[in-house]
Curated annotation (Swiss-Prot):
S-S pairs: none
Name of the protein in its database record: Myotubularin-related protein 12
Pfam family, one: 3-PAP
GO BP of this protein: phosphatidylinositol dephosphorylation
Record InterPro entries: MTMR12-like_C, MTMR12_PTP, Myotubularin, Myotubularin-like_Pase_dom, PH-like_dom_sf, Prot-tyrosine_phosphatase-like
Keyword set, alphabetical order: Cytoplasm, Phosphoprotein, Sarcoplasmic reticulum
Gene: MTMR12
Sequence similarity: Belongs to the protein-tyrosine phosphatase family. Non-receptor class myotubularin subfamily.
Amino acid sequence: MLGKGVVGGGGGTKAPKPSFVSYVRPEEIHTNEKEVTEKEVTLHLLPGEQLLCEASTVLKYVQEDSCQHGVYGRLVCTDFKIAFLGDDESALDNDETQFKNKVIGENDITLHCVDQIYGVFDEKKKTLFGQLKKYPEKLIIHCKDLRVFQFCLRYTKEEEVKRIVSGIIHHTQAPKLLKRLFLFSYATAAQNNTVTDPKNHTVMFDTLKDWCWELERTKGNMKYKAVSVNEGYKVCERLPAYFVVPTPLPEENVQRFQGHGIPIWCWSCHNGSALLKMSALPKEQDDGILQIQKSFLDGIYKTIHRPPYEIVKTEDLSSNFLSLQEIQTAYSKFKQLFLIDNSTEFWDTDIKWFSLLESSSWLDIIRRCLKKAIEITECMEAQNMNVLLLEENASDLCCLISSLVQLMMDPHCRTRIGFQSLIQKEWVMGGHCFLDRCNHLRQNDKEEVPVFLLFLDCVWQLVHQHPPAFEFTETYLTVLSDSLYIPIFSTFFFNSPHQKDTNMGREGQDTQSKPLNLLTVWDWSVQFEPKAQTLLKNPLYVEKPKLDKGQRKGMRFKHQRQLSLPLTQSKSSPKRGFFREETDHLIKNLLGKRISKLINSSDELQDNFREFYDSWHSKSTDYHGLLLPHIEGPEIKVWAQRYLRWIPEAQILGGGQVATLSKLLEMMEEVQSLQEKIDERHHSQQAPQAEAPCLLRNSARLSSLFPFALLQRHSSKPVLPTSGWKALGDEDDLAKREDEFVDLGDV
């Protein structure tokens, strides 16, 4: 059969030249099987999706040793995706495709997910862009989700090659208008078919009621108020229609500089301290205007800094922290470690893996973000300080750090609904420019910075270190990162709520028609069946038990901070910067005054951070209280499931965390069955139990990169780099050489 073939020309070590020469072109053989093939292969189109161009007799390579095996089929390009329709797709094992995305298939690439396109001309790899004078014999597509697709066009008709290559380059790289995104085509065509999930209780923060609810939940309504001064975006297009500011702040101050220079509330701690953010005022040269701005900021500052009762610490993220350029440069280097064209290239880079990883600085950037979040947590939790985050537009690093702080301090944010609501509040309503940062329109490459991916990587570090504390899994985080590039959801395709609201109208003469109903990414039923969604929920997570009124009354005298941050009892006197359970207001006031003088002392802050960090990690973890990550060198790891999932050689068959989780689920099922028998004996009502995902029950067949890596598809045979096998000597000598004794010591 021609469904699978082998061709030469692999990268790296060259394979021996085959002696057999075929004089029959593949398209001639396909002519005899054309009717059968057309019945087996079907292009599935979404509502509003249109086919633009296609090419037949395309060979899709898979990553394999020195030879390159592949599958023949059709390569098509629509206004939504690039898709490969293989001739033997029906041969896939159903067990391997249970975690299947209903929107994007295994061989589908959304146009927004394409990162770089390369062509191979006479075994030379070149970047493709613009109009081509010569068309390649091989097409390589690097995706933003780190997949690598290789297509051989050697047996495709010349006209089809020109059409498909030109079409893919144009529709993935040419600048677009916002209204020309597939998002609007889909919403228009599927307007009557979009059904929202009734179980989705994510707070969208698009109403005043949502903000009031959040204030009440965090007990922040004593000092802060929700305002509607920007309703209809009359004051500022950058801000949401509703947000929260300090109660003493007059609403006319919000209008004075179009929302700039205003402390906007993010979250309140149980001890009364709060996390706020502020965008910078416009830069002015005129001394008179500068003086007006200074007096304005002095007045604003007094609303949140009223010593000794309230002390504020400012964190200027624009000048004293990471730059967006650093993040982009680091990620550009980092992602190259995983965009592997073939197995030989993988093993070549394996020798220098650690040096390449270190030189990218990506893990160091993650560490710095987590450390900054811990520092702010220490100020709020231990020193009762308000913290004000400063940034030029308060829409990048402010979103990142404020979200991490809330994840560490608020257990509600570690539930799935709480986490989704957090992203809605801090990122979507916070004005993070997803459209520019993801470069969805391809208008300005310099604006593309993976700030949200950095946030998800930081969250993964917390999930990896403290799995029982989170209701969601790393698989949830991985599919969330993939959803950045699926243009049927509005969540990650606008720069601000104003931009979304002003573009929700239908195009056409009928101006009285209803606005478009855009889907939200939080409706996971659009992408996954219920069975697949079980992998997004952590079976080891246990909700915090609710106390009855009698228990709450008995515990009311204790300070809430003690429940989340156990402190060393042997220390008789409190260290500087740590408030204990003193009730004497005078002592607290004096401590407040002393700390306010030391705000700018970096040594003192570093000492406070180290004591706070060490003290927390020396105690047992309360998964429903304060949660701090380890940030030492070895503790910050590579998010293997996201970055290595498409590399067959990186899999551990029947091993990794998925094997451990499978065993734990077996134990949970056994405990649940015993509990059911006990309940039956006592004739009590059986409580609904969470069913263990059947996908995890046979761990021996699973990969460490489950559920993304498919097993028994590729060879995982190591390939020694050229430099390695040459150093070992002649092949005959290797066969005769006896095994050397290696002392492993205590290993």
